Protein backbone atom coordinates (compact mmCIF):
# COMPACT_ATOMS: atom_id res chain seq x y z
CA UNK A 1 0.00 0.00 0.00
CA UNK A 2 1.46 3.32 -1.05
CA UNK A 3 0.75 6.35 1.07
CA UNK A 4 0.83 9.90 -0.19
CA UNK A 5 3.68 12.07 1.06
CA UNK A 6 3.18 13.16 4.65
CA UNK A 7 0.39 10.67 5.35
CA UNK A 8 0.33 8.82 8.60
CA UNK A 9 1.55 5.23 8.80
CA UNK A 10 1.55 2.77 11.69
CA UNK A 11 4.58 0.54 12.12
CA UNK A 12 5.35 -2.47 14.27
CA UNK A 13 8.94 -3.29 15.18
CA UNK A 14 10.42 -6.52 16.46
CA UNK A 15 13.50 -7.30 18.55
CA UNK A 16 13.82 -11.01 17.73
CA UNK A 17 15.25 -13.37 20.32
CA UNK A 18 15.27 -17.14 20.71
CA UNK A 19 13.17 -16.93 23.91
CA UNK A 20 11.36 -13.59 23.60
CA UNK A 21 10.41 -11.15 20.85
CA UNK A 22 10.05 -7.53 21.88
CA UNK A 23 7.40 -5.59 19.98
CA UNK A 24 6.98 -1.83 19.66
CA UNK A 25 4.48 0.35 17.82
CA UNK A 26 5.20 3.64 16.13
CA UNK A 27 3.72 6.39 14.04
CA UNK A 28 5.41 7.94 11.01
CA UNK A 29 3.66 11.30 11.33
CA UNK A 30 4.69 11.94 14.93
CA UNK A 31 7.91 9.93 14.45
CA UNK A 32 7.38 8.36 17.85
CA UNK A 33 7.75 4.77 19.05
CA UNK A 34 6.76 3.04 22.26
CA UNK A 35 7.18 -0.43 23.73
CA UNK A 36 4.10 -2.57 23.20
CA UNK A 37 4.44 -6.18 24.37
CA UNK A 38 6.74 -9.16 24.61
CA UNK A 39 5.83 -12.30 22.66
CA UNK A 40 7.17 -15.54 24.10
CA UNK A 41 9.00 -17.38 21.33
CA UNK A 42 7.72 -20.84 22.31
CA UNK A 43 7.14 -22.27 18.85
CA UNK A 44 6.65 -21.10 15.28
CA UNK A 45 2.87 -21.55 15.56
CA UNK A 46 2.64 -19.65 18.85
CA UNK A 47 4.93 -16.87 17.60
CA UNK A 48 3.01 -16.21 14.38
CA UNK A 49 -0.40 -16.54 16.01
CA UNK A 50 0.59 -13.84 18.53
CA UNK A 51 2.13 -11.62 15.84
CA UNK A 52 -0.95 -12.12 13.65
CA UNK A 53 -3.18 -10.85 16.46
CA UNK A 54 -0.99 -7.76 16.85
CA UNK A 55 -1.08 -7.10 13.11
CA UNK A 56 -4.88 -7.48 13.08
CA UNK A 57 -5.19 -5.07 16.02
CA UNK A 58 -2.70 -2.38 14.93
CA UNK A 59 -3.05 -2.74 11.13
CA UNK A 60 0.52 -1.61 10.41
CA UNK A 61 1.57 -0.31 7.00
CA UNK A 62 5.08 -1.72 7.42
CA UNK A 63 7.24 -3.77 9.79
CA UNK A 64 10.74 -3.18 11.14
CA UNK A 65 13.00 -5.98 12.40
CA UNK A 66 16.19 -5.41 14.37
CA UNK A 67 19.25 -7.01 12.81
CA UNK A 68 21.80 -8.13 15.42
CA UNK A 69 25.40 -7.32 14.53
CA UNK A 70 28.71 -7.43 16.36
CA UNK A 71 30.16 -4.04 17.38
CA UNK A 72 32.46 -4.13 14.32
CA UNK A 73 29.45 -4.60 12.01
CA UNK A 74 30.01 -8.26 11.21
CA UNK A 75 27.06 -10.68 11.38
CA UNK A 76 26.11 -12.03 14.81
CA UNK A 77 24.92 -15.58 15.60
CA UNK A 78 21.36 -14.21 15.61
CA UNK A 79 21.65 -12.23 12.36
CA UNK A 80 20.40 -15.02 10.10
CA UNK A 81 17.58 -15.94 12.51
CA UNK A 82 16.36 -12.33 12.58
CA UNK A 83 16.53 -12.14 8.77
CA UNK A 84 14.56 -15.36 8.49
CA UNK A 85 11.95 -14.05 10.95
CA UNK A 86 11.57 -10.86 8.89
CA UNK A 87 11.23 -12.84 5.67
CA UNK A 88 8.58 -15.03 7.32
CA UNK A 89 6.69 -11.91 8.46
CA UNK A 90 6.73 -10.60 4.91
CA UNK A 91 5.58 -13.92 3.48
CA UNK A 92 2.82 -14.57 6.00
CA UNK A 93 1.39 -11.07 6.33
CA UNK A 94 2.34 -9.50 2.98
CA UNK A 95 3.74 -6.38 4.66
CA UNK A 96 7.00 -4.67 3.74
CA UNK A 97 9.84 -5.39 6.17
CA UNK A 98 12.85 -3.18 6.82
CA UNK A 99 15.84 -4.44 8.78
CA UNK A 100 17.60 -2.00 11.11
CA UNK A 101 21.04 -2.46 12.66
CA UNK A 102 20.24 -3.07 16.30
CA UNK A 103 23.74 -2.80 17.74
CA UNK A 104 23.50 -1.51 21.30
CA UNK A 105 19.68 -1.39 21.37
CA UNK A 106 19.56 -3.72 24.40
CA UNK A 107 22.25 -1.66 26.14
CA UNK A 108 20.22 1.50 25.48
CA UNK A 109 17.05 -0.23 26.67
CA UNK A 110 18.72 -1.24 29.94
CA UNK A 111 19.93 2.34 30.41
CA UNK A 112 16.38 3.66 29.83
CA UNK A 113 15.01 1.24 32.42
CA UNK A 114 17.73 2.15 34.95
CA UNK A 115 16.90 5.82 34.40
CA UNK A 116 13.30 5.08 35.33
CA UNK A 117 11.97 5.47 31.78
CA UNK A 118 10.80 1.89 31.35
CA UNK A 119 9.91 -1.37 33.06
CA UNK A 120 12.43 -4.15 33.60
CA UNK A 121 9.91 -6.79 32.50
CA UNK A 122 9.59 -4.94 29.17
CA UNK A 123 13.30 -4.92 28.25
CA UNK A 124 12.82 -6.62 24.87
CA UNK A 125 9.89 -4.35 23.96
CA UNK A 126 11.97 -1.34 25.02
CA UNK A 127 14.75 -2.54 22.69
CA UNK A 128 12.18 -2.87 19.86
CA UNK A 129 11.07 0.69 20.59
CA UNK A 130 14.66 1.93 20.30
CA UNK A 131 15.07 0.07 17.00
CA UNK A 132 11.85 1.60 15.68
CA UNK A 133 12.82 5.08 16.88
CA UNK A 134 16.13 4.77 14.98
CA UNK A 135 14.16 3.90 11.87
CA UNK A 136 11.69 6.76 12.33
CA UNK A 137 14.49 9.24 12.97
CA UNK A 138 16.01 8.28 9.62
CA UNK A 139 12.81 8.77 7.59
CA UNK A 140 12.42 11.77 5.34
CA UNK A 141 9.21 13.74 5.82
CA UNK A 142 7.93 12.61 2.41
CA UNK A 143 8.75 8.89 2.80
CA UNK A 144 6.20 6.57 1.21
CA UNK A 145 5.51 3.08 2.53
CA UNK A 146 5.07 0.36 -0.09
UniProtKB/Swiss-Prot annotation:
InterPro entries: RNaseH-like_sf (IPR012337), YqgF (IPR005227), YqgF/RNaseH-like_dom (IPR006641), YqgF/RNaseH-like_dom_sf (IPR037027). The keyword Hydrolase applies. It comes from the Bacteria. It is an enzyme of class 3 (hydrolase). SUPFAM superfamilies: Ribonuclease H-like. It is found in: Cytoplasm. Keywords: Cytoplasm, Hydrolase, Nuclease, Ribosome biogenesis. GO terms for cellular component: cytosol. Its EC number is 3.1.-.-. SMART domains: YqgFc. GO terms for biological process: rRNA 5'-end processing. GO terms for molecular function: nuclease activity. Could be a nuclease involved in processing of the 5'-end of pre-16S rRNA. Belongs to the YqgF nuclease family. This is Putative pre-16S rRNA nuclease.
Amino acid sequence: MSLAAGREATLLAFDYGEKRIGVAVGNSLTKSARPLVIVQNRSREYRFEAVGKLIAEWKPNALVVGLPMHPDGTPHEMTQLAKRFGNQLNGRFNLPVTWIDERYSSVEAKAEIRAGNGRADMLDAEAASIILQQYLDGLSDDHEFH
